[in-house]
Amino acid sequence: MAEEEIDYNSQPCHAYACRIQDCLQRSGYNESKCTKLIDELYECCAKFYMSKGEDARSTSCPKPNLLKLKIQQRESKDVDAVLLEFAKK
């Protein structure tokens, strides 16, 4: 049985996810340089779930419960710096 091919370009919020990947590659995977783009993706995903329901899925969005956690974490002003310092050790 063949797996169904996913058209990623038609996935909700896919363009935001691609912008993050481009930013991470350009910045040497320094997440703090891409903060605005990450926030934009999460905002897009939140709108997606609000309009389609929490059972909806997009390959570009975390599942609703993880998205809520990620948004809460990003509200912490030190989240990027902490992650970068941890990664350096």
From Swiss-Prot:
Domain annotation CHCH: ranges: 10-52
Main location: mitochondrion
Subcellular compartments: Mitochondrion intermembrane space
Disulfide bridge positions per record: 13-44, 23-34
Ranges spanned by the short sequence motif Cx9C motif 2, renumbered to the chain: 34-44
Signal peptide: none
Motif (Cx9C motif 1): 13-23
One GO term describing the cellular component: mitochondrial intermembrane space
Annotated keywords: Disulfide bond, Mitochondrion, Repeat
Domain notes: The twin Cx9C motifs are involved in the recognition by the mitochondrial disulfide relay system.
Database matches in PANTHER family: CX9C MOTIF-CONTAINING PROTEIN 4
Protein family: Belongs to the CMC4 family.
Name the record gives this protein: Cx9C motif-containing protein 4, mitochondrial
Organism listed in the record: Yarrowia lipolytica (strain CLIB 122 / E 150)
Gene name as annotated: CMC4
